[in-house]
């Protein structure tokens, strides 16, 4: 079970909203979000309602302002708790529809280019666990939550292009 508290103002001030479940529309409770406390679990935050727009992965900890979670603004409109599993495994493909060279991964990968000599991933199949795909190496840039399922093209995970820099397992480390 997870628990997150979102605050309208920086440094955990102002009106707040506490949640233990997914919330498709935070605008009902808050007009903006400038700080967050994650008491348990791993959460994905979204800039728009209904789990759309820019995504931000937050683990247990305190985030006194939106720059701490690499946010571009105080616009957080939905959030979801990411389920935890014991094992993680996914397959990367160099072409759409799971064609071309296939590589399998079960650990974090800080640089897809260094490990697999690829700068783009055209399709994915998440076999176990949840992952976050980052557009840049070393877990930077746009983030995309990957749940166990098939992704036949980059648009299936919400990206505009196939640019891929790093992959990280979603694991609650505490």
Swiss-Prot record:
Species in which this protein is naturally found: Macaca mulatta (Rhesus macaque)
Family affiliation: Belongs to the beta/gamma-crystallin family.
Organism placement in taxonomy: Eukaryota, Metazoa, Chordata, Craniata, Vertebrata
Residues with S-methylcysteine modification: 23
Chain spans, region Connecting peptide: 84-87
The name this protein goes by in its record: Gamma-crystallin C
Subunit structure: Monomer.
Record bears the keyword Repeat: yes
GO-annotated biological processes: lens development in camera-type eye; visual perception
Assigned keywords, A-Z: Eye lens protein, Methylation, Repeat
Gene3D superfamilies from the UniProt entry: Crystallins
PANTHER family, per database record: BETA/GAMMA CRYSTALLIN, GAMMA-CRYSTALLIN C
UniProt function note: Crystallins are the dominant structural components of the vertebrate eye lens.
Molecular function GO labels: structural constituent of eye lens
UniProt note: domains: Has a two-domain beta-structure, folded into four very similar Greek key motifs.
Domain Beta/gamma crystallin 'Greek key': 2-40, 41-83, 88-128, 129-171
């Amino acid at each position: 079970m997870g628990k997150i508290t979102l605050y309208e103002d920086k440094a955990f001030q102002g009106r707040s909203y506490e949640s233990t479940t997914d919330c498709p529309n935070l605008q009902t409770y808050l007009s903006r979000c400038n700080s967050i406390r994650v008491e348990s679990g791993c959460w994905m935050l979204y800039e728009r309602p209904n789990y759309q727009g820019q995504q931000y992965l937050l683990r247990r900890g305190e985030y006194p302002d939106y720059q701490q979670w690499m946010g571009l603004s105080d616009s957080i409109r939905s959030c979801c708790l990411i389920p935890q599993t014991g094992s993680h495994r996914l397959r990367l493909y160099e072409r759409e529809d799971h064609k071309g060279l296939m590589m399998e991964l079960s650990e974090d990968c800080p640089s897809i280019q260094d490990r697999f000599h690829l700068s783009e991933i055209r399709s994915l199949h998440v076999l176990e666990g949840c992952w976050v795909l980052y557009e840049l190496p070393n877990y930077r840039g746009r983030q995309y939550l990957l749940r166990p399922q098939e992704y036949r093209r980059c648009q299936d995970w919400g990206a505009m292009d196939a640019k891929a820099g790093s992959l990280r397992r979603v694991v609650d480390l505490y």
